[in-house]
C-alpha cells in the first residue's frame, strides 16, 4: 500500500477554496489542511495499513474508516499531540456546522456511507461530513483503548 502525501502548493484551486471555506480564511484553510492531510491522516492511513495486513484488501466502509480514525487519534495521543488533536477537533466542529447533512432521513450515517461509498468518497463535502463527524466521535470516545491496545485487539493478540 502507498500513502500519497498531498502538498498545499499542488492542490487544485477548488480544493484550496474548500479548505479556505471550511477554515474560515485563507490562513486557517492552510492550517486546517496541514493539520489533517500532512498530520492526522498519516497515522489514519497506518490504520488502513493494519487493516490490509490483517484482513486483506477490503472495500471502504464506515467501520474501516472508524478504525483508521481511532488509530490516527490514539497514535497522536501516544506521541503527545494533544494540542494538534484539539486544533483538529475545533476545526472539525466548525466544519460540521457548515456542511449540510447528506444522510437521508431514516438512514444512519453508517448505512449511507456503506451503500454509497464510491459516490461519497468522490465528493469532498459529503466525505468531509462523514470523516469530520467520525473525528469528533472518536475524539470524544472515552472508552477507546490506547494505541497499543487497539492494535493488539484488532490483530487478535491479548
Question: What is each residue range found by the language model?
Answer:
Residues 4, 38, 143:
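Functionally constrained cores in energy, signaling, and assembly domains
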Residues 61-78:
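An active-site-proximal "capping" alpha-helix that borders the catalytic cofactor pocket
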Residues 55-56, 104:
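Surface-exposed, polar/charged faces of alpha-helical domains
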Residues 40-53, 69, 73:
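Active-site recognition of the HExxH zinc-binding catalytic motif
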Residues 29-41, 58-66:
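Soluble non-cytosolic domains of exported or imported proteins
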Residues 78-158:
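Long, well-structured alpha-helical subdomains associated
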Residues 1-34, 49:
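Active-site scaffold of zinc-dependent metalloenzymes
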Amino acid at each position: 500500500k502507498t500513502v500519497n502525501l498531498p502538498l498545499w502548493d499542488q492542490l487544485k484551486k477548488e480544493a484550496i477554496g474548500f479548505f479556505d471555506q471550511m477554515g474560515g480564511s485563507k490562513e486557517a484553510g492552510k492550517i486546517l489542511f496541514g493539520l489533517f492531510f500532512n498530520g492526522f491522516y498519516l497515522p489514519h492511513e497506518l490504520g488502513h495499513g493494519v487493516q490490509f495486513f490483517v484482513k486483506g484488501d477490503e472495500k471502504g466502509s464506515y467501520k474501516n474508516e472508524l478504525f483508521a480514525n481511532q488509530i490516527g487519534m490514539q497514535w497522536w495521543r501516544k506521541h503527545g499531540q494533544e494540542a494538534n488533536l484539539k486544533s483538529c477537533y475545533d476545526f472539525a466542529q466548525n466544519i460540521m456546522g457548515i456542511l449540510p447533512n447528506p444522510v437521508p432521513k431514516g438512514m444512519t450515517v453508517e448505512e449511507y456511507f456503506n451503500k454509497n461509498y464510491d459516490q461519497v468518497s468522490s465528493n469532498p463535502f459529503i466525505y468531509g461530513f462523514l470523516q469530520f463527524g467520525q473525528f469528533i466521535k472518536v475524539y470524544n470516545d472515552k472508552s477507546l483503548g490506547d494505541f497499543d491496545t487497539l492494535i493488539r485487539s484488532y490483530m487478535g493478540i491479548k
